[in-house]
Amino acid sequence: MGGEEKILVSVRVRPLNEKEKTRNDRCDWECINDTTIICKFHNLPDKSSYTFDKVFGFECPTKQVYDDGAKEVALCVLSGINSSIFAYGQTSSGKTYTMSGITEFAMDDIFAYIDKHKQERKFTLKFSAMEIYNEAVRDLLCEDSSTPLRLLDDPERGTVVEKLREETLRDRSHLEELLSICETQRKIGETSLNEISSRSHQILRLTIESSSQQFSPESSATLAASVCFVDLAGSERASQTLSAGSRLKEGCHINRSLLTLGTVIRKLSKGKNGHIPYRDSKLTRILQNSLGGNARTAIICTMSPARSHLEQSRNTLLFATCAKEVTTNAQVNLVVSEKALVKQLQRELARMENELKNLGPASASSTSDFYALMLKQKEELIAKMEEQIHELKWQRDVAQSRVENLLKSTAEERSSSSSMDSRRRRISYDSTDFDEPRMLNNLGKSNLYSPDEDGFLLDDTTPQFPGHNLHDKWEEMAQSTTQEPEDACKEVRCIEVNSGEAERVQIQDSLDDIVEKKEYEQNYESQKDDADSSIKNIDMELSLYTKPEAEDGVSVKKLIEDVQETEQSVEKQKQSPKKEEMEQYLSRDMSEQVTKSLPEEEQCVQEYGAYDKLEAQDVLTINKLEESQQTEQSVEKEDTKKNLSSKKEDLKQNLSMDQSEQLYKSPPEDEKCVEVYEGSDKDDNTYEALKKKVKEMQKTIEYFMSIQSAEEKQSPSFNIIDDTLSPGEYFKMRRSRSCRENLLFTKAAAAAASRGFIFETTNTSFDSDITVSMDAQSIKDSDTETSSSSFHEFMAGLRERTMQHHSTHSDDTDTKTMKPENTDDGGEKTEFERQQSQIIELWQVCNVPLVHRTYFFLLFKGDPSDFVYMEVELRRLSFLKDSTETSRKQTAKAVTREREWLAKQIPNKFGKKEKEEVYKKWGVELSSKRRSLQVTHKLWNNNTKDIEHCKESASLIATLVGFVDSTLTPKEMFGLSLTPTTFNIKPSSGWKFSNSFSRISFTG
């Protein structure tokens, strides 16, 4: 019981007295309900309505005031909680009258409670009384009260009154006798407002201590609490009381102490954070616990309803309003003293001795026999339980040993079975390259769809590549895919095992056969769906080429026919000793121009126009699937075979229709492109000449395809795509790594740029995604006509310069002087150096990633075929140069992060001596700090004119990142990705390079 609670505030309004009635004084206050009082005088500046816990009107008797406003607080003293009851108000408002009745009713209830519970607890009541007269404390129970008492501070009890007499009550009559003495000793006087006016503050204190009659650890403590009945003297005005002399002096002391009480109440109502002036008055000092400490408090404010006391009544209500907000923290007071505990134990010991004496000898002997019998039974039970425990322990040990043996044997069996299984699988894998499920899986992935190519052309992702390099094993993959499915399935696992393990291996083989059969069925279903989707994709791609081309575009049909004628001429040399070598070289060369895998080779053949070869390969793919299906005899596989056959016929019809349509769609401008190679067709009949011509024709086809893609935005073929797909959807339409789709991506990017779409190029970032946006719409808004015409002029210039390059190269071939690709005349080399210098300067201005600079610098070294890529790079950097200042800061931050990452790679890539050589080479002192970071900050610095510095920077970065030799990677794989793309690098995902160099193989 106890805790924080607010003071219980009640207001009692007395009726008009005889003097007020004689003066015809009006009643201005009215109680509208049990909690609200209002003022009927409307000239008040402040509010006229007040709400309290309880409001008592004229007709309410003192008994009701006690029951509703003070009884609960007064009786909590019996539970060990301190309590206080105040009577506050102006002079002649009825304070003494109210407190006399409340004191009497409270004493009656307290003694009634004691009489009811005296069998359970022992109560001790102590009574003391004092008054504060002219700021002097007097003892009301002492006859000689002329000597004032001092106030002392006790660390346990707080403020105490020295030498205050405290009487222990015998009964109720004794209390009444003491109350009458207090009434006689209290100072009273007569004023003009009250004939019997109290001239002092009276405090009656009743202390109650209670302890349990029966001893127990829970009830050994003693409850000690006190209740205070405080009858305050009324505040008065000298002008109203007409006091003088001693009465005036008394009134001054009364008002001063009440003013201090009001100040304390007001500050307590606002919280206990500041200083509370308890010591400014002896009244507040004595009642400190009652006001804001360990006690429950009830205040009864009395007031007069007369208009003549209106201001005093309002002050009383304001005091009550503040007191209503004061919070006290009452706690139960437990007194656990050693003396009380010793006394309680002594009483309990005496009681038990008396009970023992009262027991007779007969009863004692019978009791001892009974206890002896019970003790014997308990001992027997304990012995029996010990035997059971011993037996259970033995059983537990046996069970544990069995479990351990079982676990050991199981582990040995698993290890032996796993070793046999791994050896058997190793023998099986050595005997054949593919089993049935893997054959179908590889067949589907090679000819129909490659999941590794998914997302290759996305504008915001980086493709994931396998760790191995497909260039080294291109011939092996080509040969493996051309094998017949029956040959791959003829291998049968033959495992010879020991006689002791034959049965286990046989069971394992049966399980493996079941698993492989299920995998075969699942792969078969997935490959059937992939075949359908692949055929649909082929139809869609072929349909794109059947659309009419733009007026100023070049014809691809003528070039396709040249490629076919060249291939036929190569086939005529089957009798030559170099036949096989030439076929392998052509296959490898075409694959290097586009991609690194078997499905990409087939897509490259589609792009270059070898439709007959494409048809043959697709038919071969379908035949492979049909032959692999013959190993299964189910009805479902037969149905699938029929579906694939129908797809094959549709594909053949579509291919033949497309070829027939394109015979009528060859513009006359194709002659200009074919003239480049006409002179060499008659003379170059050797193997080297044919190989060189095929290579040059492939590059020319690629160039004209890129030009066509840039201008295709006005052609019907591109309009079809543009009408059906939004720009954002068109970038995500296809995710293949084929040559055709690389060109389609370039086409879509150019068209979207002309229409005002936004391309995003994101520099490499190592702590956050930093995106630099090129808003083509802003360029279009500034000067739409100029932008469109400049783009066409740029593409026309590229086409004209490339024709010049090819014409020069054609003249060289007429003279049968074959120059290496990395050689050029003095004028072209000077032009290349000029473009290279401009690109390096723009790299520095645009904060291009260092890895991009390195690979571009190492890959493009001045070959005639590098001209287009140098122009595209210059065009891209010129767009980036116009980016905003915010984007420039973000890209600079990304380059700084890249340098920090490269600095971390130096200790991983070089040994101690090699690192010192690198530091010395780049002018970094060995005794300095953060030497690796100093080196990386010197890479690709502002010295853009120094080509040797650029070479050394590119060489070091290539070593740190782990670039493969640039000759093994086709330039088209890097050059075609120079269109604006988006790449993001996050700290959690490690390194992801941009699409400009994401197709490069890395080592280390």
Curated annotation (Swiss-Prot):
Coiled coil regions, renumbered to chain: 335-402, 517-576, 634-661
InterPro entries registered for this protein in UniProt: Kinesin-like_fam, Kinesin_motor_CS, Kinesin_motor_dom, Kinesin_motor_dom_sf, NACK_C, P-loop_NTPase
GO cellular component: a single term: microtubule
One Gene Ontology biological process: microtubule-based movement
Pfam families recorded: DUF3490, Kinesin
SUPFAM superfamilies: P-loop containing nucleoside triphosphate hydrolases
Keyword Coiled coil on entry: yes
Kinesin motor domain segment(s): 6-326
CDD domains assigned: KISc_CENP_E
GO molecular function: ATP binding; microtubule binding; microtubule motor activity
Positions contributing to ATP binding: G89, Q90, T91, S92, S93, G94, K95, T96
Annotated Basic and acidic residues bias: 569-582, 634-652
Keywords for this protein: ATP-binding, Coiled coil, Isopeptide bond, Microtubule, Motor protein, Nucleotide-binding, Ubl conjugation
Annotated region described as Disordered, given as residue ranges: 567-599, 628-671, 802-830
Biased composition (Polar residues): 653-663
Family: Belongs to the TRAFAC class myosin-kinesin ATPase superfamily. Kinesin family. KIN-7 subfamily.
Protein name as it appears in the record: Kinesin-like protein KIN-7I
Originating species: Arabidopsis thaliana
